[in-house]
Amino acid sequence: EFVKDVFEGFGNTGIHAGLIGEIGCSWPFTENEQKVVRAGARAQKVTGAAINIHPGQNEMAAMECIKVADKAGAELSRVVISHVDRAVREPANRIELAKTGCTLEYDLFGREGYYPPRFRVIDVPNDARRINEIKELTDKGFEKQIFISHDNYTKSSLCRYGGWGYGHILRDAVPVMKIKGLSQELIDTIMIENPMRMFTFA
């Protein structure tokens, strides 16, 4: 199905997938979810497309997803882990995840609320903290493994309903990145070069 979505498109729409996923995983990481991650790895080999994985809500969930993808033969430099800003809170774990070669996606820009207690994440970092964490990663040489976005999936995310809208990163976050010491070259790497490389089929 993944291969068909890339090569033939979705139904009769003429629209083709540009990546594999987002593959949704939960915690505990179920066998069926692991099977889908393995299928994504196989589809990556055939299509050359990148894989995007949504990890479950556990500090080690992202690493477990990467282990399954790696064992299935995925090219980890073309695997993106979503929601790092809520899923991997310990700095050492972020570094270990980056060392695998995968891309860490900070995709909750503009969201500063809390997740329900059942997710066991009460404090969600604000944009300033997100940028601090990104700088920590770039300082260690992982600038080519960072994605950023805003996970605008509800009406409340849109400007007309009181949200930040789709311009938030360019309008608000980039100036803060510069204040916090990220060079224009680093910003261009994160915002232009990384997506361009990931969305180019290997």
Question: Where are the predicted features?
Answer:
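Active-site glycine- and acidic-residue-rich loops that bind
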Residues: 81-91, 111-135
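Distinct, well-ordered alpha-helical segments
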Residues: 31-34, 58-73, 90-98
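Acidic (Asp/Glu)-rich catalytic clusters
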Residues: 5-15, 42-45, 70-74, 94-101, ...
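Active-site beta-loop-alpha junctions enriched in small/polar residues
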Residues: 25, 56-58, 82-87, 109-111, ...
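Mid-to-C-terminal alpha-helical segments outside catalytic/metal-binding sites
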Residues: 168-202
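Structural preference for beta-strand elements that scaffold enzyme active sites
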Residues: 17-19, 50-52, 78-80, 101-105, ...
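Active-site gating/metal-coordination segments in enzymes
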Residues: 1-46, 103, 110, 120
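Short acidic/histidine-rich active-site segments
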Residues: 106-107, 142-163, 187
